[in-house]
Amino acid sequence: MLFARIIVSLICRSKVLPLGKTQYIWFFSRLIVSLQDVILNSFTMKQILLLTMATIAIVSTQAKNITTPKTNGYPITQVPFTAVKVNAQTFWGQRIKAAREVTIPLAFEKCETTHRYDNFKMAAYTLQHPGHNGLQTPQWDVSKLKCLPFDDTDVYKTIEGASYILQTYPDNRLKQYIDSILDIVAAAQEPDGYLYTSRTINPAHPHQWSGAKRWVEEEALSHELYNLGHMVDAACAHYQATGSNKFLNIARRYADCVIREVGPRPGQVCVTPGHQIAEMALTRLYLLTGDKRYLDEAKFLLDYRGKTSTHTIYSQSHKPVIEQTEAWGHAVRAGYMYAGMADVAALTGDTAYINALNAICNNIVSRKYYITGGVGARHEGEAFGADYELPNLTAYNETCAAIAMVYLFHRMFLMQGDAKYIDCMERTLYNGVISGMSVDGGRFFYPNPLSSDGNTERQPWFGCACCPSNICRFIPSFPGYVYAVKDRTLYVNLFTGNTAHVEIGGKTVVLEQQTDYPWNGDINLRIQKNQAKAFAMAIRIPGWAVNTPVPSDLYRYTDCQTRNYQITVNGKPVDGVKTDKGYLIINRVWKKGDVVSLHLDMPVRTVVANPQVTDDRGRVAVERGPLVYCAEAADNTSHSIFRFLMPTNPQFNVVDRTINGQHQVSFGVKAIEVDGQTVDTDADGRVKVSDTRLTLIPYYAWNHRGADDMEVWLPQSIEALGNYR
């Protein structure tokens, strides 16, 4: 057996199969195991090594026959995060630094201390000891272990995030650590590629959600395909970071197992994912390998949803995906499914998918979208609510759901080139996503309510730790959302200090962006190098700068400022600037040293919700630039924030403020002060109104000083104040 492993290891490590067909490795390894005695008795070691190298050459030729797709199908191409170096001291640079130095190491540590690695080790032990059934070691009865069937994905997601870090901040120790984890993961894989520790640890007594056999509970809670999805995403990222196919081969073997066993053909199990993400991941695997089977499987998983025996709104299986026009059910599942639909539609041209996505996105941003960019109103089912059901104190707004919305909105932009999707993405990024992690990267929210009575606090980890590990993989990928290219047009979507190397028409353009956004609205774009000569620069004018908080009537500003920006090139006004779908288009022959200067006014503005949002009637939210603000008790100790009345025409004052939080966290923000009134009652029950001042901080910054009261929507009348807390 040792001999066989040595030979197969030579093949796997040869790197002739970075994208090759893993079935060749599997077949060859089985052949060696069965014939190793004959081989050892019939050939010298030199002959064996020559035979091995010949096999490598043959398999290498097979691998080269795979054609990687030239495009992901979207008409607009994302500039990869590896081509955009975000400055370390910028708003987003600090968050990437926190993810690199705190969040990802913390997640790896938690995977150790919470026994996530042990799950793989126990599964490997079971595979290595076929007679073991778990009964001799009761702690290995999975039904009694304190684990969830998707705990494996926390390992995968953290590896994915670490792999993104490796691509921008090479770290040999981190690379070696990941390699050691992959040894554990590989050992837990069953001979046919199946990798799901909740069953493999003890097939006789798997986790209660796993079902007696493979796939039978997939449409409920087994998460077998969910595990596949995160594994594939992580494996693709690891391959792109290291060039090693070690993880990629593991993931492909599981994906190939799924393709063999899950589908509409006779002898297969016809199920669709109970928790979506495999659709996006399999599409990504197709783009990396060129193996169309993965794209076909992704489309099957979407096309058959609503056509199997399971019909639940919770998992969006209540009807076929092309018939869905509203966002319903578990918000994370939904967001991942919609993003997967976009990926498949881009590659297949399925207009029915696109029509459904247009309707769903419109439903979200016009009726089910929080001012913070979060989604998922209900704790029950972590789900979207009905139209205009947007409670504040009980809002769920899972961090993972916000990340899913970023995936969806960005894909819709790549498909349609409309800035309204980036406007929504920006709102979600600056409020709904980063509120899910503390500024130092060490504590996390699962739900993100818009009101708190002091019972909500970030935690260092969760039993169900999907949100921290999701942050691990998302934050390092942020630079990939800043720019995009279509033909000879460069889209500037987000504003953060960075240097980008962009390919336009096959020629390199180096662009430097300087800004202190989101604290002020001055953005300078300097051409450092330009081999492309003439091209169009499409600069997004944020919706908040043109009186449009969201692309619907769900929210509106109480004032009316229709133009809050100015733009110059080399200090001079630009003549003949065109606007298209929310972008200013400047088309010219660019020279090294050219500077585009965009100034966005950043007044403090109040927002009101559509009257059909009953929880927000008579109340206003406060915004400045892309940031939503909130009142927190820690800044307002002289009165209850729940009894504050915002005046009809408030006068705001923007001030610098340092938040000295718990756990040695200290950071600066732009705070907002406003004079108003506080309402109370005397001993006889009579209402008393007195003048006071309220301080507001960015929503993402709350809860760094312990659990405390917090409010986003502030009343403007005693009637709206409602019951005192």
Describe these PLM feature segments:
Residues P170, A186-E190, G243, I259-G263, ...:
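Helix-capping and short linker residues that terminate individual alpha-solenoid repeat units
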Residues L174-A186:
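Aromatic-lined substrate-binding rim segments of carbohydrate-active enzymes
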